[in-house]
Amino acid sequence: MRIIPISQQECSELLQRVSIGRLACSSNDQPYVVPVAFSYEPDCIYIFSTLGKKIEWMRKNPKVCLQADEIGNRSNWTSVVVTGTYLELNVPQYHTAQREHARELLAQCSEWWRIPLSGARDRALVSSMETVFFRIDIKSISGLRAIPEAEEPVHQ
């Protein structure tokens, strides 16, 4: 197996194909990683969540990272890492249009709301949960691909 970097175009294509990734944030030098449903646009990533540890931590430290991948097997995979800044879209006077845009994009993924609400079993609890739409303003994107030995180009 060989691991090679992929182009920005290939990174963008993967982020458009997949809708689940892992969001990393940190507080007081302690990292925290959770799965999230997301929707990608060239300059940002939209995510929906309920209020909890990750939102509290990102409010304190807005530097975040998102990792998404496609895995065939241990020697055939592609991974993309996005770094950026957390921006909450729940301030009505500033972000109503962006929040609605995020909702429309995320609604294209039929499971977009399930991850944040998966812990809630009771309908009353779900309706009382504070929800948060946010975006990651992208600072950098990079990616790697693992190529199985049999697929490596032969040089003469």
Regions found by a protein language model. Give the residues of each.
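Helix-adjacent hinge/juxtasegments
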Residues: K53-L89
